[in-house]
Amino acid sequence: MLHLIYISIIVVLIIILISYTRKPKYFRITAPRSVALFHGIHPLNPKNYKTFSEEFETILNNAIEDGDFKGQLTEPCSYALRGGKYIRPIILMEIVRACQLQHSFGAPIYPAEAALAVEYFHVASLIIDDMPSFDNDVKRRNKDTVWARFGVAKAQMSALALTMQGFQNICRQIDWIKEHCPRFPDPNQLGALLCTFVSHSLNSAGSGQLVDTPEKTIPFFKIAFIMGWVLGTGSVEDIGMIERAAHCFGNAFQLADDIKDHDTDTGWNYAKIHGKRKTFDDVAQFLQECKKILHGKKIYTSIWNEIFQKVINVALGT
């Protein structure tokens, strides 16, 4: 029932947001930021994982201080967001960067708002996943889960706030592109495309959450990969291949996690069913296919070596 309520609210928001993104080209959908989210390295300069992580942490802190969350939900939302690995927003930002090295439309796109959106969606799913009605977990990232610290009601409202703010961030990203990249082709249509795609992905994630399968993990990587590709002005015709790359990476990520949790997981676990050796081989195979696709689209950069190694390290327990 809770899942259906969330999806219903999201669908209503999508209809509203899409209608606004079809207004005249220079009509602003969102209020401008009171502060810039980040001042630092040029968006097209190469970065390693540590640099990207620190950059996104600055973006996140500035967004929270700028009022992305209001009132009594500020503390639980901030609490949930801090301390993550930020792999999804890093993937999104790197794909945008790599795409623009091949082609751009004037000023480089800085995808800070889109990166926030994918992290907000992901963290909202973690809050719900930890709830007593799902996994009933009281610890995550070596600290109390949101519901255990702030109560079930605030946890539910925080997940909703994160989801709704994520869509707001997508709209803010479109406004940013209109303001800074006047040669970008039809940003209004892009906004409608992104909102529709994200709502579909969140629905898939919610369905996977109900039955505890990898489908609760993969959709958030699809959001990161595809939003990065589209914002980086990658070809719409190639979205299917980018989605396949995201599917492979998401599967590898989930299977590595299953190996790590082999001895403690009480729910469905691929490694328990097929064994650690086969599961590790599958992780390697999925990563290899993902790498092949990214190479083919000329967006495989040095940071992917770090990202892939992090997945392998999870599987190895190192």
From Swiss-Prot:
Pfam families: polyprenyl_synt. It comes from the Viruses. The chain crosses the membrane at residues 1-21. Dimethylallyl diphosphate binds at R140, K216, T217, Q254. Mg(2+) 2 binds at D129, D135. Its cofactor is Mg(2+). Pathway: Isoprenoid biosynthesis; farnesyl diphosphate biosynthesis; farnesyl diphosphate from geranyl diphosphate and isopentenyl diphosphate: step 1/1; Isoprenoid biosynthesis; geranyl diphosphate biosynthesis; geranyl diphosphate from dimethylallyl diphosphate and isopentenyl diphosphate: step 1/1; Isoprenoid biosynthesis; geranylgeranyl diphosphate biosynthesis; geranylgeranyl diphosphate from farnesyl diphosphate and isopentenyl diphosphate: step 1/1. Mg(2+) 1 binds at D129, D135. Its EC number is 2.5.1.-, 2.5.1.1, 2.5.1.29, 2.5.1.10. Belongs to the FPP/GGPP synthase family. Asfivirus trans-prenyltransferase subfamily. This is Trans-prenyltransferase. It comes from African swine fever virus (isolate Warthog/Namibia/Wart80/1980) (ASFV).
